[in-house]
Amino acid sequence: MPMLQSIKWENNTVYILDQRLLPDKVEYLKCTHYEQIAGAIENLSIRGAPAIGIATAWAVAVASMSLNASSSEELFSDLNPVFQRLINTRPTAINIKWAIDRMQNLIKNNLSLPVSELKDMILNEAIRIHNEDIQVNKRIGEYALAFFKEGCTVITYCNAGALATGGYGTATAPMYLAKEKGIKFKVIACETRPVLQGARITAFELMKAGIDVTLICDNTAGALLRKGMIDFAIVGTDRTVRNGDVANKIGTYSLSVLCKENNVPFYVAAPTSSIDLSIPSGDMIPIEERSFEEVTTIKGVKIAPEGIKVINFAFDVTPAKYVTAIITEKGIFKPSEIKHLRLRQ
């Protein structure tokens, strides 16, 4: 597994890798208050659906330790503003709500315990959520490894890598496992405008792991697909819903259509924590809109005229008809089969 971690727990403190600075600097943010973690989620210091789910769990643990509640019931009540603050950080990724639901269920089921014991349970649950994610990603990688044939070329989008998760990544997990097994393959990484997660993060982490990776502008993908230079695509997901529609980084939909047009398989790596069976179709997924400055500047340098109007959706929805298969820690499924999955609680 790559040495660099998106988030870690040391000496009763959460440390978050500030991914805004990659690849130029590797710096960790020291977080001793839940608001610091919430801010890091909002400003993309930490990003990737599984990683922000883990960060949410750690935020709840940090908050609970700082509260001076006299009973478990009082602790639960005092945590309600924390839950709401975290839910409001980023609306599209389901993992934040998933982590909060899990923490709330733990607390509700143990309100009879002394508050000190409940706080210990909350901390241990955060550790468990973090460790589980690493194992889930590895299992996704083991299933997806079947698609990695000797000499293949795979295209990926945004960053569904180790730095978007607790470790291994979702879409990148089979890449790390293929590398370990000595399978020769190439990765094409789309730069992923406007925040350039593919260029800054995916290219960075794959190069660091010694994986053969080539960076392209997003609008080069179609040309490579038409020339037959890509064997398959694999991407992550921030929320996959009951009918198999997939919300992921803006531009994923475009790539899926190009793959369909050129008869190239399009796979989605989805931990069950990112699957939301309460929503029937992608049309109902809330889509986050972010600051115009992400589009009009790159690393603080203006690239557009002052006052230009901007549309900046952070995510788009890929309809199930463009998805060849969804790879979870429970196996590989057709999009139409997702509604039958028993999800991880």
From Swiss-Prot:
Residue stretches in coiled coil: none
The keyword Nucleotide-binding is annotated on this UniProt entry: no
Location of the active site: 238
SUPFAM superfamilies: NagB/RpiA/CoA transferase-like (SSF100950)
The EC number(s) this enzyme carries: 5.3.1.23
Binding residues annotated for substrate, in chain numbering: 47-49, 90, 197, 248-249
Organism: Thermodesulfovibrio yellowstonii (strain ATCC 51303 / DSM 11347 / YP87)
Pathway: Amino-acid biosynthesis; L-methionine biosynthesis via salvage pathway; L-methionine from S-methyl-5-thio-alpha-D-ribose 1-phosphate: step 1/6
Cited InterPro entries: IF-2B-related (IPR000649), IF-M1Pi (IPR005251), IF_2B-like_C (IPR042529), Initiation_fac_2B_a/b/d (IPR011559), M1Pi_N (IPR027363), NagB/RpiA_transferase-like (IPR037171)
Site (Transition state stabilizer): 158
Role played: Catalyzes the interconversion of methylthioribose-1-phosphate (MTR-1-P) into methylthioribulose-1-phosphate (MTRu-1-P).
GO biological process: L-methionine salvage from methylthioadenosine
Family, similarity comment: Belongs to the eIF-2B alpha/beta/delta subunits family. MtnA subfamily.
Protein name: Methylthioribose-1-phosphate isomerase
GO MF entries: S-methyl-5-thioribose-1-phosphate isomerase activity
Pfam (any one): IF-2B
Reactions the enzyme catalyzes: 5-(methylsulfanyl)-alpha-D-ribose 1-phosphate = 5-(methylsulfanyl)-D-ribulose 1-phosphate
Keywords carried by this UniProt record: Amino-acid biosynthesis, Isomerase, Methionine biosynthesis
